[in-house]
Amino acid sequence: MPKIKCLLKVEDPPNFLVLHCGGNNIPGDKGEKSVDLRLKINNTLVSFAKLLPDTVLVWSQILPCQHWRGGVDHEATDMVRKRLNSFVATALIRTGGKYIRYPEIQIDCPHLFAPDGVHLSELGNQFFLYRLQQGLQTFITKPTEKVSPKLGELGPWLCYD
């Protein structure tokens, strides 16, 4: 928040602010409960909305990992990730925000992840950047759209003639 306050002294507020969080803070290693993390995220969203009332907040989905750091229960942690994404998407859309999904990035696609199973591979990063760009372009050209891509919408690499 301090960085944004500083930038607002010399720049106009942005039209869009993309919020992309990694999964490192998903509970597991410090005993924090997922409800506590949701509360922190919600408080941050409220603060951003007050600070930037004319800026559209965009939630960029927390991506899955093949291996979560700290040796936590993978299935439980992934469920927390999905619930966090759903919670934030619902909260933002309700208040005029937007949501970007990454449907191609799935844990059962090992070629999309680096050998550590946490970070994206070059190909995974390309999918990520494509969907991020597509989402922003959609929200700029179609202001009433709230989610990108739509469920079932294929990327151009999956379209066949």
Report each predicted region and the residues it spans:
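Alpha-helical cap/lid subdomain in secreted, periplasmic
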Residues: K3-D161
